[in-house]
Amino acid sequence: MQHLVFVYGTLRHGESNHTYLQHSQLLGQFETKPEYALYDLGAYPGLVEGHQSVHGEVYLVDEHTLAQLDILEDVPVEYRRDTIETPFGTAWIYIYQETHRLHSLIDSGDWCQRV
């Protein structure tokens, strides 16, 4: 079975964990509706509900890759999977759950443009 996944941080092209998606198909860039907030947690970002648009990419992944992403994202402890509507269809999105660690908002909503 194939799944769509929206990625917004270290899984994006050129970022440190992109190798997890090396055999997956990039469907395109996507900017969410202003329903989220993106925080810099140091080595990676955390996305939570908010009032900001977040930039990312949508990939077509297989079951094995999705399972590997769940392990990487520490589902269901650190992140949980939810769905988001994209121009490519309904995609999985990883929502950060450890809100006590949120301190540094990424104003641009783009992990790749953080300062």
Curated annotation (Swiss-Prot):
The active site is at 73 (proton acceptor). It is an enzyme of class 2 (transferase). Pfam families: GGACT. Substrate binds at residues 8-11. Keywords: Acyltransferase, Transferase. The keyword Nucleus does not apply. It comes from the Bacteria. GO terms for molecular function: acyltransferase activity; gamma-glutamylaminecyclotransferase activity. One of its GO terms (cellular component) is cytosol. Its EC number is 2.3.2.-. Putative gamma-glutamylcyclotransferase. Belongs to the gamma-glutamylcyclotransferase family. PANTHER family: GAMMA-GLUTAMYLAMINECYCLOTRANSFERASE, TROPONIN C-AKIN-1 PROTEIN. This is Putative gamma-glutamylcyclotransferase VC_2546.
